[in-house]
Structures are given as C-alpha cells and as structure tokens.
C-alpha cells in the first residue's frame, strides 16, 4: 500500500488537480481507496455508466474506443475524471496492460466531498472547461 503523502503528491501533479490546495488533495486521497487490477482485466467498459475516477499508481493501462487502441496510460495519469462528476456513460474502455494499482474514488464518495469543499468543485470545473476547449481544438480521430 502506498503512503497517503506519496498519493497526494502524485494526484497534485495531475493536470486536473494541479491547482488544488494541499488540503483539497488530502481530502480526495482520504476519500479514495487503493485497488489492484490483474493484467488483462477490463476496468472500464465503453458505454457503461461511470461510477468512479482512477489515478494510476503503478503499471500501465490501454484506453480503447470501438475496439481501437487510443493510448496507453501510466503512473500519475487518470481515467474516469468526467464520469465521477456526472455519472454518464464511459467514452472509452480501459484495460490493465500490466498488473495495475490505482487510487479509486467512487462517485458516491466524490459528491459529498464537493459539497463539503465547494472551492474544489469550482477549481475542477474551471480545469475541465480548459480540457474541453483543448479537446475541441484537436482534429477528429
């Protein structure tokens, strides 16, 4: 198990959370749990409802859409960022390429955290808007 200070540091380096205060990041880490996924396990299925957010601690994962590989994720990267907020369907599938450890934050833990820390919700909203604008500028795949 990874110590919470190291997890908080890893989370704060992620572009979605890099502007949060140390207190906000600690609150996220304290509400999350570490999960181990075996190699080859499908963690997220495209089209299924989103129930949580994952920060990769160790290992690699493959992101695919319509059976086509989009990218590989590694330590410090996340998936499920938007689904944890809106619970909407997953836009892609994610499969453990190697043994994978993630810090997982389910939606039911995340929502009360946002209500308790409204500044966290605002900071994430601003960051998600920036990510959306960036995505809109990319050519279609």
Question: How would you label these PLM feature ranges?
Answer:
Residues 1-141:
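Cytosolic regulatory regions built on CNB/CRP/Popeye-like sensor folds
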């Amino acid at each position: 198990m990874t110590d919470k200070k190291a997890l908080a540091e890893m989370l704060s380096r992620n572009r979605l959370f890099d502007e949060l205060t140390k207190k906000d990041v600690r609150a996220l880490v304290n509400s999350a749990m570490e999960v181990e996924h075996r190699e080859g396990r499908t963690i997220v299925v495209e089209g299924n409802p989103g129930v949580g957010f994952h920060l990769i601690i160790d290992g690699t994962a493959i992101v695919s859409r319509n059976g086509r590989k989009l990218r590989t994720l590694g330590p410090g990267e996340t998936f499920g960022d938007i689904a944890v907020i809106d619970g909407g369907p997953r836009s892609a599938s994610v499969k453990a390429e190697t043994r994978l450890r993630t810090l997982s934050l389910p939606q039911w833990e995340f929502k009360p955290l946002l209500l308790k820390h409204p500044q966290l919700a605002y900071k994430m909203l601003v960051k998600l808007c920036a990510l959306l604008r960036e995505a809109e500028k990319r050519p279609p795949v």
